[in-house]
Structure formats: C-alpha cells, structure tokens
Amino acid sequence: MTERLAGKTALVTGAAQGIGKAIAARLAADGATVIVSDINAEGAKAAAASIGKKARAIAADISDPGSVKALFAEIQALTGGIDILVNNASIVPFVAWDDVDLDHWRKIIDVNLTGTFIVTRAGTDQMRAAGKAGRVISIASNTFFAGTPNMAAYVAAKGGVIGFTRALATELGKYNITANAVTPGLIESDGVKASPHNEAFGFVEMLQAMKGKGQPEHIADVVSFLASDDARWITGQTLNVDAGMVRH
C-alpha cells in the first residue's frame, strides 16, 4: 500500500468504532495524519491507539457548535488544519412510524444532518483559510434510495446529506474542494451486530446482487480513493457501496 496521502491531515468523525474506525485506519495507512473524533472520548482514544502514531484522538459532539469550534481549534494547533474531512458520525435508530414523534425527529436531524453541516462549515472554512484544495466525503446510506421502513427520520437525514453534498460541490468547486457521498448498504459493523433487528438483514441480503455482508473496510477503500489525487476530477457524486442492492 502506497502512502498516497502523505503530508495530508484527515478528520474522521464517529471514528471510535465500525466504519469510522476502519476509515481512519485506512487513511493512516495511506500516510495521512488522522484525527479520530467521536462523542465517546475513551472510544476515540482506544481507536487512535490501535491505529498507531499517525492517529490523534479528539472528542467532539458534532451537533454542538461550541464543541466543533474547539475541535477545529485543536486541529489547527496540532497540524495546521485539515485537507480531508470524512463526515461519518451519525445515530442509527429503528423506530416504527407510529412511534416517531417530534423529539425523535429533531434528535436524528440535529445529529445526522445538522451535525454534518456544522462540521463541514468549520472544516471547509479551515481549508479555504489555508488556501488548500480539499476533500469532503460524507457517509450517507442506501436507505434513502430504498425507503427503508422503521427509519423515517434517518432516511430523511441521509437524503439531506446527499442533497447537501451536491450543493456543496457546486459552492466549493471554485476552491478546488470536492464533495462526494458514499452510501453503504448492509455492513457488518458493531451497530449491525448489536441490532435487535438482526433477523431482518437476511431479507436485505436477498436484494443484493452479491451475497453476504459487507465489511467496514469495503467503505474505507472507497473513501481512500475519494480522498486521493486519483479522484481529483470527481465531485458532487454519490457512490453506492452495497453489493448491488440499489441498481440505477
């Protein structure tokens, strides 16, 4: 594996476990200095320690503007600013439509969509202030295309992330900052393993062109590509990484 991201600094949110941790590990293997951020401070520290000397842990709550401001101030002091932003942090609820109330809706939108905006606002401002070309890669979900049941607020938020990514590409292209989204399908992450709805995942596999459960590393590989110079002419796109569940 070549260090194609040597000299770059990447921030990965929600990186204490699962897909986020795999992305952080892959970007570090590619040579980047990686900021492992998570609301779970101890989890972030453990993940950074497992990745090695290229990783630094900084706890943050992406839905709290003050916490995000402090996060980027610390990144600026440590590294001089980011080149790559991976918006991975989110919460994944399974709630039947009849049980979706306004508090639930606001909580999911605040973290999964507004939190993505808060971090992206701060991250791209930091890139622009340094005059850096940059990468913004947001982890959305193929549930947006599938209209997955029992996840109405989550589906809406992730659809918003896809729309936001397209608009962001238009706004930031003139600064050589690209914006793309990745939509995972069924991934054997910590959340999936712990889900009380595990029995439903067999049906998801039936819809896939390729059988089996994806691994967090499958998403990390795609993010690695989008973060690299190989993807310098790709922006405003959404890449489905779901074994062909969504085909269009």
Curated annotation (Swiss-Prot):
<comment type="pathway">
    <text>Cofactor degradation; B6 vitamer degradation; 4-pyridoxate from pyridoxal: step 1/2.</text>
</comment>
<dbReference type="GO" id="GO:0042820">
    <property type="term" value="P:vitamin B6 catabolic process"/>
</dbReference>
<keyword id="KW-0560">Oxidoreductase</keyword>
<comment type="subunit">
    <text>Homotetramer.</text>
</comment>
<dbReference type="InterPro" id="IPR002347">
    <property type="entry name" value="SDR_fam"/>
</dbReference>
<dbReference type="Pfam" id="PF13561">
    <property type="entry name" value="adh_short_C2"/>
</dbReference>
<keyword id="KW-0520">NAD</keyword>
<feature type="binding site">
    <location>
        <position position="141"/>
    </location>
    <ligand>
        <name>substrate</name>
    </ligand>
</feature>
<feature type="binding site">
    <location>
        <begin position="11"/>
        <end position="35"/>
    </location>
    <ligand>
        <name>NAD(+)</name>
    </ligand>
</feature>
<dbReference type="InterPro" id="IPR036291">
    <property type="entry name" value="NAD(P)-bd_dom_sf"/>
</dbReference>
<dbReference type="GO" id="GO:0050235">
    <property type="term" value="F:pyridoxal 4-dehydrogenase activity"/>
</dbReference>
<comment type="similarity">
    <text>Belongs to the short-chain dehydrogenases/reductases (SDR) family.</text>
</comment>
<dbReference type="InterPro" id="IPR020904">
    <property type="entry name" value="Sc_DH/Rdtase_CS"/>
</dbReference>
<protein>
    <recommendedName>
        <fullName>Pyridoxal 4-dehydrogenase</fullName>
        <ecNumber>1.1.1.107</ecNumber>
    </recommendedName>
</protein>
<feature type="active site" description="Proton acceptor">
    <location>
        <position position="154"/>
    </location>
</feature>
<comment type="function">
    <text>Involved in the degradation of pyridoxine or pyridoxamine (free, phosphate-unbound, forms of vitamin B6). Oxidizes pyridoxal to 4-pyridoxolactone, but does not have activity toward pyridoxal 5'-phosphate, pyridoxine, pyridoxamine, pyridoxamine 5'-phosphate, 4-phthalaldehyde, 2-nitrobenzaldehyde, pyridine, formaldehyde, 2-carboxybenzaldehyde or sugars.</text>
</comment>
